[in-house]
Amino acid sequence: MKSAILTGLLFVLLCVDHMSSASQSVVATQLIPINTALTPIMMKGQVVNPAGIPFAEMSQIVGKQVNRAVAKDETLMPNMVKTYRAAK
C-alpha cells in the first residue's frame, strides 16, 4: 500500500514539474521489455526530434502495455503503446 501511494505521489510530482514543458515527449528511462505495463518511473520528459507521445499525456499511458521492446532513452511513439489514442 505504501509503495502505491509513493508511486502515485512521484507521478504527481513529475507531472507538476513538467507541466510547462509542452514540447517534451515521453522517453524511456530504462529498457522496457515487450508487453510490459508502463509505470511513471520508466518514463521522463525530454525535448526530442522527431516528437513522440507528448509528455503532457504521460498519465494516459501509465498502465498500458508496450507492443515491442523499448530501448533506454528511446522516444515512445504512439504506435508503440497498446490502445493509446492521442488527446484531441
From Swiss-Prot:
The record marks 30, 35, 39, 65 as: Important for ice-binding. The keyword Transmembrane does not apply. Residues 25-84 form the AFP-like domain. Keywords: Antifreeze protein, Secreted, Signal. One of its GO terms (cellular component) is extracellular region. Its main location: secreted. Residues 1-23 form the signal peptide. It is found in: Secreted. Disulfide bonds: none annotated. It comes from the Eukaryota. InterPro entries: AFP_Neu5c_C, AFP_Neu5c_C_sf, Antifreeze_III, SAF. Belongs to the type-III AFP family. Contributes to protect fish blood from freezing at subzero sea water temperatures. Lowers the blood freezing point. Binds to nascent ice crystals and prevents further growth. This is Type-3 ice-structuring protein 1.5.
